[in-house]
């Protein structure tokens, strides 16, 4: 097993840990989930480049009769990338005392102001940064508003 194989195993393990945390652990942290809203995906060009480069590496490994374990590890990495970028749905998860946005816990007390832009983006102003929340379905913003009013 080469250093390349070890690095590939490390990347696969990190992506797998992230997928398990995002799918199973995060919704159970900090109390019961009150509301989970699917968000719009960001640009997919990065994911196309990532998976495309891995496919090129797989092709190169196969045509040059590279190590079989490396080819399988590259395939597993491509599948993990495909899952993370295309199958997994990003979401905002509201709890009793705060919410998870981009896998970061934010308490309601940190929200200084909220605005709704014309194109349906909810803007939350925190102490030092702004969160731009782009929901998949515009009607979900009403659910978020009702939840935030009831918890504040």
Curated annotation (Swiss-Prot):
Membrane spanning residue stretches: 6-26, 45-65, 67-87
Main location, first listed in the record: membrane
Assigned GO CC terms: plasma membrane
UniProt keywords, alphabetically: Cell inner membrane, Cell membrane, Membrane, Transmembrane, Transmembrane helix
Subcellular location field: Cell inner membrane
Coiled-coil boundaries: none
InterPro entries assigned to the protein according to its UniProt record, in alphabetical order: DUF986
Membrane association type: Multi-pass membrane protein
HAMAP family: UPF0266 (MF_01071)
Similarity annotation: Belongs to the UPF0266 family.
Record's protein name: UPF0266 membrane protein YobD
Organism: Escherichia coli O127:H6 (strain E2348/69 / EPEC)
């Amino acid at each position: 097993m080469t250093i390349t194989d070890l690095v590939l195993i490390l990347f696969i393990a990190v992506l797998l840990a992230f997928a398990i945390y995002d799918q199973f652990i995060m919704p159970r942290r900090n109390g019961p989930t009150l509301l989970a809203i699917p968000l719009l995906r960001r640009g997919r060009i990065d994911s196309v480049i990532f998976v495309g480069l891995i496919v090129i590496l797989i092709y190169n490994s196969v045509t040059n009769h590279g190590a079989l374990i490396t080819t399988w590890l590259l395939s597993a990495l491509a599948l993990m990338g495909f899952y993370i970028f295309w199958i997994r749905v990003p979401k905002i998860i509201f709890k009793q005392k705060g919410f998870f946005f981009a896998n970061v816990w934010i308490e309601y007390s940190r929200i200084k102001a909220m605005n709704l832009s014309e194109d349906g983006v909810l803007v939350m102003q925190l102490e030092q940064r702004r969160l731009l929340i782009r929901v998949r379905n515009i009607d979900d913003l009403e659910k978020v508003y009702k939840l935030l009013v009831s918890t504040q």
